[in-house]
Amino acid sequence: QTCELYYNLIYDNKLAISTGKEVFMQECKEIKPDVLYVVPKVLEMVKQKIEFLDKPLIKLLLPRLLKKIFGGNVQYIFSGGAKLKEPVKQFFSDNNIVICEGYGCSETAPMISVNHFESPRDTESIGKLLDNVLVEIIDGEIQVAGPNVMLGYWEDKEKTNAVLVKRDDKVWYKTGDSGEIKDGFLYYKGRLSDNYKLSNGKFVNVQEVEGVISEFVQAPFIIYGEHDSHNALITTESIDKLNEIKIILQEKLNLVIK
């Protein structure tokens, strides 16, 4: 709400709120927005609809078609609420549409990091840390301090004490998210509650594994737990394709499970 509602109201911009993803594209044609604020699911939906057509002429005209889908006037697209999958991000980037991705929580009012359009950006990250926000990674968890951190939950001291901790004369908010910081950029690895321990003693995050698999597997897949020889179900159109995916995933997942 801070980004899409309050910011635009302060600057007296015209604001339209979509009534649902089913009518999102039709609404874009009618409203012709200059800026879009969306969740990743909307961008995934647009990508899937275009790829479903799978016609050479459409692929040739993709940059123009994408702009038309969003009403024809879109200059900026902001994505938030969840991590944008790398294949989706790359799809739009390849077609001259840059997605600005940010990260934050309601408890931090809300921004913690953002990938700006103009400044140096790292598209694999969830953005560069804001100047007035302090972020530390404690036991793998993203923790935040600064003037944007809430005072607490209304009339719920127990819940407040569970997420706010005092350290170095500052109040830190425990996000419950796993991440790391490199060169001032924040990288999201998933929810800490999605971490589980393998039989070899190593920890792995389900969301991070899903992200790697989804880069190379277009069909639905399931990660359903740890077994002696297998813990995921992936469908492919041929044995050759399966063997190709297995080789790629073995290399990629070894970088994630460490």
Q: What is the role of each PLM region?
A:
Residues Q1-L15, K29, D34:
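Conserved short alpha-helical elements in the N-terminal third of ANL/AMP-binding
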Residues K14-S18, V23-I31, E44-V46, I50-E51:
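Internal alpha/beta domain cores that form substrate/cofactor-binding pockets in large enzymes
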Residues G146, S178-I257:
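AMP-binding/adenylate-forming catalytic core of the ANL superfamily
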Residues L15-S18, E86-D139, N148-G152, N161-V165, ...:
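Conserved ATP-binding loop and adjacent catalytic segment of the adenylate-forming AMP-binding
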Residues L129, E136, Q143-L198, F203:
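Conserved ATP-binding/catalytic segment of the ANL
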Residues E22, K41-E44, A82-K83, N148, ...:
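Alpha-helix/helix-capping structural signal
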Residues Y7, Y11, D34-V38, V46-R121, ...:
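Gly/Ser/Thr-rich phosphate-binding loop
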Residues M25, P63-L66, E210:
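Short hydrophobic/charged patches on amphipathic alpha-helices used for structural packing
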